A protein has these predicted regions:
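Short, mixed-charge low-complexity intrinsically disordered segments
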Residues: 39-65
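A short, exposed loop/beta-hairpin motif centered on an aromatic-Gly-Thr core
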Residues: 20-33
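Short intrinsically disordered terminal tails
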Residues: 1-6, 61-65
Length: 65
């Protein structure tokens, strides 16, 4: 598998209407894809995309099967 095509864990942090910080985790190739996935799978983020305040790439471990 090409290193550029590997999926990495991303955490998408966002604030709800009460300003409470929440997060969703996704495996994606880059931060933009993680944002797109968050908008697809989280109704609140889809309706309020500017509620995202951080997208962080978490540490990941290569696993060979």
């Amino acid at each position: 598998m090409n290193k550029n095509n590997m999926l990495k864990p991303y955490t998408v942090h966002y604030r709800d209407f009460q300003n409470i910080r929440l997060e969703n985790c996704f495996y994606a190739s880059d931060a933009y894809e993680a944002r797109t996935l968050a908008m697809e799978f989280n109704k609140y983020i889809n309706e309020h995309p500017n509620s995202i305040d951080l997208i962080r790439c978490e540490k990941w471990i290569k696993v060979f099967v």
